[in-house]
A protein has these predicted regions:
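A short beta-strand-loop-beta hairpin characteristic of the jelly-roll/cupin
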Residues: 55, 69-91, 104-107
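Conserved, well-structured core segments that form or line functional sites
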Residues: 121, 127-142
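Short, compositionally biased
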Residues: 108-120
Length: 142
C-alpha cells in the first residue's frame, strides 16, 4: 500500500483574463517536486456566460519550455500563436500546444460560443519538457 504524500486544498477561484474563472488543482509553486513533470492544472468553470460580441479570454502572452493540454467540456476555445498554430476546440475536443523554444499565444472563447453564450467548462494541464527538448520548435494540435 502506498503512503499518502499530501492533501492539496484549493486556493479558491481566480480569473485568467476575463474569460476563464479558474480553480488551480495544483501549481508549480505548491507541489512541483511531487508532481514532476506536471507544472500546473487549472479547472475553469462551470460558469455561465451571456451572449456577447466582446472577445473574452486572455490576450497575447509568452510561454517557453513546456506543453499545454486543454480539454473543453462545455463551450468553445479559440487559440492562435506566433508559430502559425491555431484553431477552435469545442466539447470533447483536445488541444495540445508545444511552447518549446518559445511562442506568444492567445486564447479566447470561440466566436460561436461568444455569440450564443451558455455553460463553459474546461481543464488545462501544463507539462514540463525534458531539458533536451526545451528548445524544440513550437507546435499546435487541435
Amino acid at each position: 500500500m502506498k503512503k499518502l504524500a499530501f492533501i492539496k486544498r484549493s486556493n479558491g477561484k481566480h480569473w485568467v483574463g476575463d474569460g476563464f474563472p479558474v480553480r488551480s488543482i495544483f501549481s508549480y509553486s505548491d507541489i512541483a517536486a511531487e508532481m514532476s513533470p506536471f507544472l500546473l492544472m487549472d479547472y475553469a468553470g462551470p460558469a455561465d456566460f451571456p451572449p456577447t460580441e466582446r472577445k473574452l479570454g486572455v490576450g497575447q502572452h509568452p510561454h517557453r519550455g513546456f506543453e499545454t493540454v486543454t480539454i473543453v467540456y462545455h463551450g468553445g476555445v479559440s487559440h492562435r500563436d506566433s508559430s502559425g498554430g491555431g484553431g477552435t476546440i469545442g466539447p470533447g475536443d483536445v488541444q495540445w500546444m508545444t511552447a518549446g523554444s518559445g511562442l506568444i499565444h492567445e486564447e479566447y472563447h470561440s466566436p460561436e460560443f461568444a455569440r450564443t453564450g451558455g455553460a463553459f467548462e474546461m481543464i488545462q494541464l501544463w507539462i514540463n519538457l525534458p531539458a533536451k527538448h526545451k528548445m524544440t520548435a513550437p507546435g499546435y494540435q487541435g
